[in-house]
Amino acid sequence: GFDHIALCVGAGGPTVLDIPNGLARGVRAASDFLMALQLTGAAKADSIANMQVRLPIVVVGGGLTAIDTATESLAYYPIQVEKFLKRYEALVAEHSREAVERSWSQEERAIAEEFLSHAYAIRSERDDAATEGRPVRIVPLLQSWGGATIAYRRLLVDSPSYTLNHEEVEKALEEGIWFGEGLTPL
């Protein structure tokens, strides 16, 4: 299953998809997602703003907004989980693990454990890269947790993003997004 789906179905005049659960938690219009990410400052490491994103991410659409949404999601995810870990560790140091986790619901606990696990893995990769004198490899971790996939109903070469700016699409693919061809939401 997927935890987040971004609907990128027309920036100028968005297409409303007639699909079940189109307004369920975790489903957002891409323009709303991108504006919230930028305007809240959630992507800034020193910001206390929070915008929860979980992996895997599916972006429905084939335009440049879909490309931006997928790449911004992948870029934001490590920041989000590392901020969560930093806050968690500070609260545990001040209060205790039991006190911090006492009021968590079952769902909150599952999400927290996921975020902490991913943040520890990212921290470990950063430490290993520094020790070994190599670049940090976060993208393979993100992909192993589900990554971000653009679901488009046609072929990549037929997508508006590719016909308008294939260089941006190529760069996004290099940054770790996946492009699913011939996919239509039910």
For the regions a protein language model found, what residue spans apply to each?
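Short glycine/serine/threonine-biased micro-segments
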Residues: C8, V59-G61, E174
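Beta1/beta-strand and adjacent pyrophosphate-binding region of the FAD-binding site
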Residues: N50-T65
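A short, basic/flexible loop-to-alpha-helix module at the beginning of a structural domain
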Residues: M35-R54
